[in-house]
Every structure is written in structure tokens, then in C-alpha cells.
């Protein structure tokens, strides 16, 4: 059995992965902000990718703060399901 390839990923997973990859490599604040905003719409599935983005060395400090605030919003507005 081989590893997971792109065809096996759902459209949602592919979009999340694409947004994360684009934002982690971007020096443009608008690109990073847009990716974080879109990932926020995925609720708790967006938390890990946003964390990966704000840990990237090329991401500006203001965008790191923006990402942390986005994670806080997700945690506040996403119902807890044990």
C-alpha cells in the first residue's frame, strides 16, 4: 500500500493544503491574510494550517498576530464536540 497521494485527498483537504503552502512561502501580507481568512472558514480544521503558517520564518510579525487572533476566533465560535 502506497502513501496518500493528492487524488485520495478530499477537495477540502486539497484546498487547506494549497492555502497553507501558498501562505507559508509568501512575503505579501495580503496573500497571507487572505489565506488565514479562508482557513478560518474551515473551523477547527483550519487551526493546524494557520499554526503552520504563523510559524513560517518568512511570515511578518503582524501576520503572526493576525493568525493567532484567527485561531482565537475559531475556538470561540466553534462548538466543542468531545
Residue ranges and their predicted role:
Residues 1-11, 30-44, 62-79:
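Structural detector for internal amphipathic alpha-helices that build alpha-solenoid repeat scaffolds
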Residues 7-23, 44-55, 76-82:
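Amphipathic alpha-helical scaffolding segments comprising HEAT/armadillo-like alpha-solenoid repeats
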Residues 27-28, 58-60:
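Short inter-helical turns and helix N-cap capping residues of alpha-solenoid HEAT/ARM repeat scaffolds
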Residues 39, 54-57:
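Generic structural signal for hydrophobic core residues of well-folded globular domains
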Amino acid at each position: 500500500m502506497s502513501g496518500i497521494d493528492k487524488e485520495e485527498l478530499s477537495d477540502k483537504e486539497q484546498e487547506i493544503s494549497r492555502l497553507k503552502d501558498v501562505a507559508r512561502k509568501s512575503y505579501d501580507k495580503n496573500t497571507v491574510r487572505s489565506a488565514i481568512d479562508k482557513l478560518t472558514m474551515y473551523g477547527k480544521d483550519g487551526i493546524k494550517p494557520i499554526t503552520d503558517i504563523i510559524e513560517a520564518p518568512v511570515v511578518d510579525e503582524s501576520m503572526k498576530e493576525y493568525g493567532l487572533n484567527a485561531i482565537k476566533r475559531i475556538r470561540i465560535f466553534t462548538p466543542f464536540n468531545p
